[in-house]
Amino acid sequence: MTTEVRADLYPSRGAAEMTTPRQDPVIWSAPGAPGPVAAKDLQGYEHDGFLTVDQLIAPDEVAVYQAELNRLISDPAVRADERSIVEKQSQNVRSVFEVHRISEVFAGLVRDERVVGRARQILGSDVYVHQSRINVKPGFGATGFYWHSDFETWHAEDGLPNMRTVSVSIALTENFDTNGGLMIMPGSHKTFLGCAGETPKDNYKKSLQMQDAGTPSDEALTKMADRHGIRLFTGRAGSATWFDCNAMHGSGDNITPYARSNVFIVFNSVENAAQEPFAAPIRRPEFIGARDFTPVK
């Protein structure tokens, strides 16, 4: 009997930090394939690892989603659910995961062609939701999230084999340049940074609030920032930022009076379904990394 050895294109969580050139396309669809993203915007996405839409959803739609977000984070049953992340210091609900299963309102947003159509075009196939959540960053001291590549975690802990995954962050409040907005290093998606250190069991319980395993070193981040620069994203409610799964990104604290909230949806190609983790002892729970690969229709 022989045991098949699984290829790992992106090694991480070993004894030392290491870089690997990207082995996968950024845009998976054929040139000229139909879809809502213009050719020049696809070129920008391929080059920078992100694209922005100034007004993906209209103000009246924003109001509906904002009301649903407020309903969910105010619901004691949702707050007590393991899918909700409550900040220890403030006791504020910061995130609610698997929101497309909890709420039919957000399930409808996932199915909206303005949303899922862009994912299909970028990934060149049908897609399923690997992860969804609503995020709330209150004013007056809400903590940010340190620099990381989502793919590093999704590969190491969820078993996504290839970089065929795209995220969208849809703003439900205005994103100023002062209230802890999303930052991305343009072009960083072309290099995979494998992080040092083993993955603890049940690492997700800590990492959803403060990333530790899978965190790049200061030296590596400095080199990447010097090479690529840093882009801070601002925009009105209803704007959206699409970004590649391997883009190095993070966000700062929000010490302003102005809260931020968004909907975050991760689409993965049905041809890139999750396997066993590449660098973790156990799978993360399904509400963080889906095992239902049913295409969004």
Swiss-Prot record:
GO terms for biological process: ectoine catabolic process. The record marks W154 as: Important for ectoine stabilization. L-ectoine binds at Q131. Binds 1 Fe(2+) ion. GO terms for molecular function: 2-oxoglutarate-dependent dioxygenase activity; iron ion binding. It catalyses: L-ectoine + 2-oxoglutarate + O2 = 5-hydroxyectoine + succinate + CO2. Keywords: Dioxygenase, Iron, Metal-binding, Oxidoreductase. It comes from the Bacteria. Fe cation binds at H148, D150, H249. Pfam families: PhyH. InterPro entries: EctD (IPR012774), Phytyl_CoA_dOase-like (IPR008775). 2-oxoglutarate binds at K137. Its cofactor is Fe(2+). Homodimer. PANTHER family: ECTOINE DIOXYGENASE, PHYTANOYL-COA DIOXYGENASE DOMAIN CONTAINING 1. This is Ectoine dioxygenase. It comes from Streptomyces anulatus (Streptomyces chrysomallus). The lineage of its organism: Bacteria, Bacillati, Actinomycetota, Actinomycetes, Kitasatosporales. The gene is ectD.
